């Protein structure tokens, strides 16, 4: 499968480019600057430089799937959350439809189901994620929305807990989020579903196929 990864130079994105390549997929790695190109090549991706705040439709041409893992980043203001986390995601939803990339995975966030209940400083981010998620649900694409808990840089354990609603908060290593995305990509049972993701005791493949 040829997969466009948005946010490829992010911490989840770098794990994802490597894992997808190792699994035999062709990865088009969307990055925002030329100085990120060598790293993408080292990870096995085919880099493409584009700004999610500008025109990006062409980046999905020839792809079978899109994984949106981009974001405004920690410390960015509400405006950046709107232009990247919402508008950037929506642009690539439209691009996926235009170019026939029928599979779309969204890296959302735990708390996006009810942004107003989150911490005040997180609400602009959660609102942007929620709005992008809703557009994806209405897109007609074979979508899956993945909502991880608080992200850490610990080494992944390969074990998670996944369910439409877990009823608790918690953490998960970014590496395990990337592994869960890899498993979800080809799991037809996840089409049209939204699920939360935390560290747990179930091997990732089993957790995903059990959704």
What are these regions (language model features)?
Residues 1-25:
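N-terminal Rossmann NAD(P)H-binding glycine-rich loop of SDR-like oxidoreductase domains
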Residues 2, 64-65, 103:
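Structural motif
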Residues 6, 26-30, 34, 73-76, ...:
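Conserved Rossmann-fold NAD(P)-dependent oxidoreductase catalytic core, especially the SDR/UDP-sugar
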Residues 12, 66, 136, 146, ...:
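Non-catalytic, hydrophobic alpha-helical segments
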Residues 29-98, 185-189:
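NAD(P)H-binding glycine-rich loop region in Rossmannoid oxidoreductase-like domains
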Residues 31, 147-152:
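Conserved SDR Rossmann-fold cofactor-binding beta-strand/turn motif
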Residues 70, 105-108, 149, 198:
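Active-site beta-alpha turn of Rossmann-fold NAD(P)-dependent dehydrogenases/reductases
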Residues 153-211:
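Active-site-lining helix/loop region of Rossmann-like oxidoreductase modules
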């Amino acid at each position: 499968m040829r997969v466009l990864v948005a946010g490829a130079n992010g911490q989840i994105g770098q794990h994802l480019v490597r894992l997808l390549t190792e699994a035999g997929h062709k990865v088009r790695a969307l990055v925002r600057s030329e100085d990120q190109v060598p790293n993408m090549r080292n990870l096995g991706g085919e880099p493409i430089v584009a700004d999610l705040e500008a025109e990006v439709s062409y980046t999905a041409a020839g792809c079978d799937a899109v994984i949106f893992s981009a974001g405004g980043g920690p410390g960015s203001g509400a405006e950046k959350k709107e232009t990247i986390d919402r508008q950037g995601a929506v642009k690539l939803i439209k691009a996926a439809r235009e170019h026939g990339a029928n599979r779309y995975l969204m890296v959302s966030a735990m708390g996006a189901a009810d942004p107003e209940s989150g911490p005040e400083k997180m609400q602009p981010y959660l609102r942007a994620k929620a709005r992008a998620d809703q557009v994806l649900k209405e897109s007609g694409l074979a979508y899956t929305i993945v909502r991880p808990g608080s992200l850490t840089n610990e080494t992944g354990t390969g074990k998670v807990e996944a369910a439409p609603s877990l009823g608790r908060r918690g953490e998960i290593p970014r590496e395990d989020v990337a592994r869960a995305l890899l498993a979800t990509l080809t799991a037809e049972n996840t089409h049209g579903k939204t699920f939360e993701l935390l560290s747990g005791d179930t091997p990732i493949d089993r957790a995903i196929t059990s959704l």
